[in-house]
Swiss-Prot record:
The gene is nodI. Belongs to the ABC transporter superfamily. Lipooligosaccharide exporter (TC 3.A.1.102) family. Its main location: membrane. Residues 1-14 have a biased composition (Polar residues). GO terms for cellular component: plasma membrane. SMART domains: AAA. Residues 45-275 form the ABC transporter domain. Its EC number is 7.6.2.-. It is a peripheral membrane protein. Part of the ABC transporter complex NodIJ involved in the export of the nodulation factors (Nod factors), the bacterial signal molecules that induce symbiosis and subsequent nodulation induction. Nod factors are LCO (lipo-chitin oligosaccharide), a modified beta-1,4-linked N-acetylglucosamine oligosaccharide. This subunit is responsible for energy coupling to the transport system. GO terms for molecular function: ATP binding; ATP hydrolysis activity; transmembrane transporter activity. It is found in: Cell inner membrane. This is Nod factor export ATP-binding protein I.
Length: 343
């Protein structure tokens, strides 16, 4: 078992390791284009034309994507888009109705148990035993994977160190903060030294400091060559962590690509948010100077490559508040899935 130590887990990794398949250096959001050929050993997860229905409801519809070993791949979509079902399919907890799934070289669900032995899962809601200490929870998770006492004695201290919980090792989970509990859940997912991590909303409910600490820990895992499948509603999280991402709705893939490339392709200009006026009326004023305008409640979103002209048209109007900013991944997500509320 490879142990996580201060020597091989950098607290501030400068870049991802080089991929053998890519034969190039990877910086920031750069990664191989999905069209490049990969050897089987370089593919962590592959879904090909996968469909899944429950009764008359199609939850996953002819979905295909490939995740390269060592990358963070984001799966984004509104509530009910099918993200949780995709995770269950990848883990072999539900069989597909159509299509094929390969995880870490194993056909799923036929050899799902073998694949799962090399996977760590961080669920949306913690499954920690609140009466047990941090150390005892790690012991319990280790037993699930059949690890012996000696192996656990070697593995647990570095994991507590990784999660920055060394001083809380013998404190009951109920007495830990939300951020500490989330880091402990991540440590539990690493107890079997997995090649692949599946993360479901890993920072939901955390304050900004705790969230950034989780992100820093996840980046250190990527620097070690771990593969991550991330489902999240938090667009900043996807932008910071993901090499590539896929947006799905009603179980179908809408778009796939690198975060910054998708922002350029789907938005490509500044965004001006306009508050305090009648958005329908203002649309006719700024519309001729915008590539696109959208109304959400009492807010007008103006997408323009000439934002100064938009500001000029609104000059002198009282009661208006303008926020000009560069486009972000949330703009892409809302453009593709709509701004209306979804349950």
């Amino acid at each position: 078992m490879q142990l996580l130590t201060r020597a091989n887990v950098s607290s501030s990794p400068s870049r991802r390791p080089e991929s053998n398949a890519l034969k190039q250096k990877c910086h920031g959001h750069s990664n191989a284009d999905n069209s490049l050929s990969r050897s089987k050993s370089d593919v962590a997860i592959e879904l090909t034309n996968v469909s899944k229905s429950y009764g008359d409801k199609v939850v996953v519809d002819q979905l295909s994507f490939t995740i390269t070993s060592g990358e963070c791949f984001g799966l984004l979509g509104p509530n009910g888009a099918g993200k949780s079902t995709v995770s269950r399919l990848v883990l072999g907890l539900a069989p597909p109705d159509e299509g094929t799934i390969t995880v870490l070289g194993e056909p799923v669900p036929a050899r799902a148990r073998l694949a799962r032995s090399r996977i760590g899962v961080v669920p949306q809601f913690d499954t920690l035993d609140r009466e047990f200490t941090a150390r005892e929870n790690l012991l319990v998770f280790g037993r699930y994977f059949g690890l012996h006492t000696r192996e656990l004695e070697e593995a647990i201290p570095p994991l507590l160190d990784f999660a920055r919980l060394e001083s809380k090792a013998d404190v009951p989970v109920a007495q830990l903060s939300g951020g500490m509990q989330r880091r402990l859940t991540l440590a539990c997912a690493l107890i079997n030294d997995p090649q692949l991590l599946i993360l479901d909303e890993p920072t939901t409910g955390l304050d900004p400091h705790a969230r950034h600490l989780i992100w820093e820990r996840l980046r250190s895992l990527l620097a070690l060559g771990k593969t991550i499948l991330l489902t999240t509603h938090f667009m900043e999280e996807a932008d910071r962590l993901c090499d590539r991402l896929c947006v799905i709705e009603h179980g179908r893939k809408i778009v796939e690509g690198r975060p910054h490339a998708l922002i350029d392709e789907q938005i490509g200009c500044d965004v001006i948010e306009i508050y305090g006026g009648n958005p329908r009326e203002l649309t006719s004023v700024v519309g001729p100077y915008a590539q696109r305008v959208e109304v959400s409640g009492e807010t007008l979103f103006c997408y323009s490559s000439d934002p100064e002209q938009v500001r000029l048209q609104l000059r002198g109007r009282t009661g208006l508040r303008l926020l000009q900013r560069p486009p972000n991944l949330e703009d892409v997500f809302l453009r593709l899935t709509g701004r209306e509320m979804k349950d």
